[in-house]
Amino acid sequence: MTRERRVLLIDDDQDLADLYLKHLRRDGIPLEHARTGQEADTFVRNRVPALILVDLTLPDLDGRELIERWADDSVSGAIPIWIVSNITPEDNLWWHTAPNVQRYFLKSKVVLSRLSLEIRATLGLPYGDRVSHRLAG
């Protein structure tokens, strides 16, 4: 299965997800959203995103369970994962040993314009004038 050049956001907080969707899509990042762990697992197995942004606290499966499940699969285990959570990284030291987890962001510290630039760099997406103009202004 071919990996799509899109990002999957997994978060049950709809208001936060709407904010991410609006900002990142406006910057030209192809972003999809899953509200539950089961919805995310189905998406990953059928669509294979290029990057996953996952919260650790979900209503059905927690983010860690998803990360561990995907790590054992040859296809999903190759997808880079960035944790975006309100739980501090120091309270979750296990993520350092998870083979597909590359980054850990504390939700309260996320700056969406910076996240957008980092996603673009990771996916090899071009930087648009709109993005650089907004950062300069």
Where are these regions (language model features)?
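Acidic catalytic/metal-coordinating carboxylates
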Residues: 36, 62-68
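Conserved acidic carboxylate
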Residues: 11
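Alpha4 helix (beta4-alpha4-beta5 surface) of REC/receiver domains from two-component response regulators
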Residues: 65, 87-117
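Charged docking surfaces used in two-component/phosphorelay signaling
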Residues: 18-22
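Residue-level signal for the "D+5" position in two-component response regulator receiver
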Residues: 33, 58-61
